[in-house]
Amino acid sequence: MSYRRLGLRSDHRRSVLRNSVTSLLKEEKISTTETRAKEIKRLTEKMITLGKRGDLHARRQAAAYIMSDEVVQKLFSDIAARYEERNGGYTRLVKTGYRKGDGAPMVMIELVE
């Protein structure tokens, strides 16, 4: 399987990941479980690569996935310019401990400066 199931139905998984990628690009740092963060990282790297391409088709592909027009604008203007010289590795995972309720490993996923 080329993706993580995350214990969710396919439509719910897609929605959770789209929201998380949008939040990460907007806030530049979010806290989530380790498994979700690894999947968010994979998708965010793809979105930033689209932003670096910068053509109309890439913008439309990103807009189809990202849930906010303001975030798409930020991706193509600010974030893509920041990573112009970097080939991949745009995000970092920092382990922050375990969630109190169920002991799930938590991480902070953030954009590399």
Swiss-Prot record:
Protein name, per record: Large ribosomal subunit protein bL17
Keywords: Ribonucleoprotein, Ribosomal protein
One of the GO BP terms on file: translation
Quaternary organization: Part of the 50S ribosomal subunit. Contacts protein L32.
Domain of life per record: Bacteria
A GO MF label: structural constituent of ribosome
A GO-annotated cellular component: cytosolic large ribosomal subunit
Family to which this protein belongs: Belongs to the bacterial ribosomal protein bL17 family.
Pfam families noted in UniProt: Ribosomal_L17
HAMAP family per the UniProt record, alphabetical: Ribosomal_bL17
InterPro entries, per database record: Ribosomal_bL17, Ribosomal_bL17_CS, Ribosomal_bL17_sf
